[in-house]
Amino acid sequence: MANKPRTRWVLPYKTKNVEDNYFLGQVLGQGQFGTTFLCTHKQTGQKLACKSIPKRKLLCQEDYDDVLREIQIMHHLSEYPNVVRIESAYEDTKNVHLVMELCEGGELFDRIVKRGHYSEREAAKLIKTIVGVVEACHSLGVVHRDLKPENFLFSSSDEDASLKSTDFGLSVFCTPGEAFSELVGSAYYVAPEVLHKHYGPECDVWSAGVILYILLCGFPPFWAESEIGIFRKILQGKLEFEINPWPSISESAKDLIKKMLESNPKKRLTAHQVLCHPWIVDDKVAPDKPLDCAVVSRLKKFSAMNKLKKMALRVIAERLSEEEIGGLKELFKMIDTDKSGTITFEELKDSMRRVGSELMESEIQELLRAADVDESGTIDYGEFLAATIHLNKLEREENLVAAFSFFDKDASGYITIEELQQAWKEFGINDSNLDEMIKDIDQDNDGQIDYGEFVAMMRKGNGTGGGIGRRTMRNSLNFGTTLPDESMNV
C-alpha cells in the first residue's frame, strides 16, 4: 500500500482552525490563487475578510515560501494606514487562511470604470496615497511588483473613503542594490526593465505612473491588440499627450507622468521625489476644476425661479438615483472644502475663482442667496442638488407627478395655499407672499394650482442647457471593449 504524501506546511508554527474563531460567510472575491470570504469573529462580532489559499495550488517549495513571504510582508507593513491590515493567519491540512481588514468599497479599478477618469485634484490625492504606499514599501525593504488599480481597495463605499493597498502575493523583500530577474506583474503596468529581467524597486514607480495616466484620461499609456504588442509599446516608451483630454490637463501633471514613466530606471523619480513634485504638493499647480460655465448658468436660472419651483426641484432631486446625482455629489464635496456639509460664500467664491470665473463678489453672493432657500446663509446638499440638477429631469413625467403629489397632501388633484404653508413649514421657509405666487401660477383663477398649471410652471423658461461635466464622469474605461480583452498577468 502506497504511503500517503506528507502534509506540507506554510507557517512555521501550528495554529487553531480558522473556524474555531470565525464564522466564514459569503464569497467576496475569487482570485487566481484563492477565495476571499466575509468572516465574523465569534466573540466580538467584528467583520473581517478571510483570504483562503488552497494548498493544492502550491506545487513546489517556492510556492509555499511565496505564501509565507506574503504573510510576513503584510505584517511588516501593518502599521501603515493605507495598507490592508492583516489580523492573523491560520493553516490546516488543506488551506492557508489570511484574516485581514474588511474593505467594503470595492476596487479602484471599478471606480475608474464607473467614472471614466478623475479631475487633477482627485487624481493627485489618489496617486499621493498610492505612491505613499510605494515609499513605505521601499523604506521597509519591500518591492511590491504588482501595482495596479485592482490591487487597491476603498475602505467603504463613501466617496471620500480611504484607499488601501492589498495583495502582496508577488512582493519581495530586497536589499539596496539588489536586482531581480523574475518576469512578474500585469501587462499594462509592467516596467521596461522588468521585461529586460533586471530590475529593482524603481519598477513600482513606473507602475504608479501608469495608474496616474489612467486616472487622468481613462485608458493606459501603452496598449495594443496583444500582450506582445503591449510589451513592444512599453519598450518604445512613447507617451500620447495629443488626444483628449490631455490638451486640457496641466503641464505639471504631464511633467510628473513623464518623470515617472522614464524608461531609464536610474533617471526615474524615486517614490519620495514623486511625493515632493509640485503637482502633488501644491494645490494651485494641481487644480481641481469642479465648476464650469454650465453650473453658473444653472444657478442663475435657479435664482429666477419662484419658491414653489425651487422646492419642487428639491423633491425631484431627492428621488433621483445615485447614478444620476453622482457627479453632483462629487461636485458638492469638491466645493465644500471644510467638509461641513454646507457651502459657504467663501467656498463658492474660491471654486469659481479656480476655474477662472470673472463674476463679481456681489454676483456670487446673489447666486448663493438664490440657492439658499431656507435663508440659513449657506447652501446645504439638498439645496445644491435642487439648484444644479439638469432641467431635463423635468421632462420625465414621473418626476413631475412625484413633485406635485408631495405638495398635494390630500391627493385632491389641487395644491391649496394651506398645503403650501404646510410644505413651507416642513422646509423651514418663511414666505408671506404665497397668495401672489399662486396668482402667478393659477391660470383659471380658482385660487388653487392643478396639475396642468403646475407642469406649465415647472417647464416654463427651461432651456436644454449644457452638461455639468457629468459626461466625462460617465465615460467608461472598459478593457473588454474599448481596449483589448487582455488584463492578464505577465
Curated annotation (Swiss-Prot):
Ca(2+) 2 binds at D372, D374, S376, T378, E383. The active site is at D146. Residues 286-316 are annotated as: Autoinhibitory domain. The modification Phosphoserine is found at S186. One of its GO terms (biological process) is abscisic acid-activated signaling pathway. One of its GO terms (molecular function) is protein serine/threonine kinase activity. Ca(2+) 3 binds at D408, D410, S412, Y414, E419. InterPro entries: CDPK_Ser/Thr_kinases (IPR050205), EF-hand-dom_pair (IPR011992), EF_Hand_1_Ca_BS (IPR018247), EF_hand_dom (IPR002048), Kinase-like_dom_sf (IPR011009), Prot_kinase_dom (IPR000719), Protein_kinase_ATP_BS (IPR017441), Ser/Thr_kinase_AS (IPR008271). There are 3 contiguous domains conserved in the CDPK subfamily: a kinase domain, an autoinhibitory (junction) domain and a calmodulin-like domain. The autoinhibitory domain (286-316) inactivates kinase activity under calcium-free conditions. This is Calcium-dependent protein kinase 12. The lineage of its organism: Eukaryota, Viridiplantae, Streptophyta, Embryophyta, Tracheophyta.
